[in-house]
From Swiss-Prot:
This is Jindongenin-1a. The keyword Signal applies. GO terms for molecular function: antioxidant activity. Keywords: Amphibian defense peptide, Antibiotic, Antimicrobial, Antioxidant, Cleavage on pair of basic residues, Cytolysis, Disulfide bond, Fungicide, Hemolysis, Secreted, Signal. Displays broad-spectrum antibacterial activity against a range of Gram-positive and Gram-negative bacteria. Also displays antifungal activity against C.albicans ATCC 2002. Has low hemolytic activity, low cytotoxicity and low antioxidant activity. Residues 23-40 form a propeptide. Belongs to the frog skin active peptide (FSAP) family. Brevinin subfamily.
Amino acid sequence: MFTLKKPLLLLFFLGTVSLSLCEQERAADDDEGEVIEEEVKRDSMGAVKLAKLLIDKMKCEVTKAC
């Protein structure tokens, strides 16, 4: 029975360490996801501003009233 306990304890320990590392990685990915969302929001606002400038420029060229 004792010879079976050592491998089981080792397996339990390694599983616990692995689970802990996975949780840390998942938490880091969640934090990274928030940063990416902020970057996407900033990029989309930049795209909206750029589109507005291009539309104004095209309107200016079409109407020749700049």
